[in-house]
């Protein structure tokens, strides 16, 4: 089987530069949160930091695919390798290969906007869906057309790839190969398609962000002393400094992280009901802390 590598230098460099830039922005947001008087602006800095960290993690997670990408050919199949992913395309199903420059008219493509980042999905009026596994621009890409799926690839030695493809295509297959897609175990985890889990985690996170926003937004105008405890008659029997408004935030953050981790742990053990219970309880806990801040900060 002949293997044709991609040129991963540009996407890898672009990814590293992007990660450094994003982390620099996150660090600047952290400094802004530290040196700005506590207010809703502080919450915005925190939110920006979290979003930038999530973006950096996403970019880093894509780099192995660009670094470890190649296309292998024999008389029976074309194997597209992208990180731990394998797309095995039977040679018998390939109808033809064309230059990607022939498809520029009407092509729509969703990809991450970094140089050399051509992993994504597109659509063309004549061919339908296109699956991009490329590290170079359209001028260097090759489209592999089959009845069901179309692949866009960019071997570094495009001419050598086409010569090898044509030679093997003319020889015809020696055995029947079925299309298959081999994914790393984590990519086939049921969690990624579990909308109920996504819904619960999203609501737990939003409830916690609401808790932080409420505390930081109320702090500047809160009195110097705020009620911390009420007796059975509803009368305040203990006061404390207004910095105590952040106690529910701290406890809520710890419980949020523990709840997410515990839920993922039991979910991985195929106990989805228990994971739902943990995450649903997490939503209720965060809502309870919101009520707590309202009671002590607005009393």
What would you call each of these model-derived segments?
Residues 263-285:
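Cytoplasmic juxtamembrane regions at transmembrane-helix boundaries
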Residues 37-52, 237-242:
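Hydrophobic alpha-helical transmembrane segments
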Residues 1-41, 132-135, 139-168, 172-194:
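N-terminal membrane-targeting/pre-transmembrane regions
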Residues 56-103, 230, 235:
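Conserved beta-hairpin
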